[in-house]
Amino acid sequence: YLNCSFLTAAWPAPKSAQPHSVPDFHARMGSGPIVLMSYNRVNGYAAECERTVFLDEPSPREPELFVLVMEARSLALSMVRPGVSCSSIDEATQELFRARGYGEHILHRTGHGIGLGNHEQPWISCGGSDILQENMVISVEPALYFDDIGGFRHSDTVLVTNNGYELLTRYPDDLEHLIVKRQNWIAAIKGALIRKAIHF
């Protein structure tokens, strides 16, 4: 017997520049960047997955920001393994953003624990004392936020394994698959989920 629940939300630009805002009920989706979020719970255990999507071709600057956030995500994931301090992961991603001139667009930590609660220890945050241990489940979600453009955030639920990590959420993360044309965006997202589920 499985007890499952699902919550999805979408933050259209410019609200996507506010990481935990509540969009106006009547807000219309622009072309992007739109942050899509899915919180899922199975038998009491939580998982989350977030992606930045576009309902039209991104502006010339948006792909650069998208790629930078994905680079920070790859950096953070490369550090995930038992014995690593969570603060060192956050420090590394923040340093990457600062080195590229985007330090003032960091609004929150790189990640957090996830399990019985949606946000719990360990905190992947500068100055924290948490150390990753095997079988911890965390989110990895480095992000950048721009008042004039919107937010760029990708979150995955990640299991810490004995020698690294395993992604527990599987959803396309490349820009090509996250540009969906306005008239078919729901069908495109549904199709991507089904294709991923078939290969699960």
Where in this protein do the model-derived segments appear?
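Active-site neighborhoods and metal-handling regions in enzymes and metal-associated proteins
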Residues: 1-200
